[in-house]
Regions:
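Flexible, solvent-exposed loop/hinge segments and secondary-structure transition points
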Residues: 23-163
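Bacterial N-terminal signal peptides
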Residues: 8-19
């Protein structure tokens, strides 16, 4: 009987040790919620309306998966896919999509072969506590205006997440 108790205690102790050790290895990851995505898109939409811009606004998570898409009135339909591509590019490559547009413009056409890359200005990573947690893509106006609107949305991330 004492032998059995000892075995049970040893097994319980080992189980506890393993579970604590495994828990210590799991990283904590901040994620972009739909509520925060709505607030980020609202900031970008306000900027677009202030400029009189007709654009598509896309917010994706850190894997480039769609969280939210808004197509403002009178925005061309083609901007939907372009906006998704810009946002996805900024998220999965963790840098503005303009980086790839600049590479192509400068003759580095190999950037066109990158899987999932849309080398067009207007995609901006959403950074929170030093980590890319998603991205925003804007399409419909000039490349610079698209990026400027996206930057306003991305800059609102900390406030959107905190509230």
């Amino acid at each position: 009987m004492a032998q059995m108790r000892r075995i049970v205690l040893i097994v319980a102790a080992l189980s506890l040790y393993v579970s604590i050790a495994m828990k210590a290895e799991l990283p904590v990851k901040k994620v972009l919620t739909l509520d925060a995505a709505k607030k980020i898109a609202a900031a970008a939409e306000a900027e677009a309306k202030k400029r009189g811009a007709t654009v598509v606004i896309v917010v994706v998570d850190d894997g480039g998966h769609l969280l939210l898409l808004e197509r403002l009135d009178d925005t061309q339909v083609a901007s939907v896919e372009v906006g998704i591509g810009k946002a996805r590019t900024a998220a999965i490559f963790r840098r503005p999509s303009k980086v790839f547009e600049d590479q192509v413009r400068d003759g580095r056409v190999a950037a066109l072969a990158l899987p999932g890359a849309t080398p067009l200005q207007g995609g901006v990573p959403i950074v929170y506590e030093g980590k890319v947690i998603g991205a925003i893509g804007v399409s419909g106006n000039t490349p610079q205006e698209d990026e400027d609107i996206a930057k306003v949305g991305a800059a609102s991330a900390a406030a959107a997440i905190a509230n």
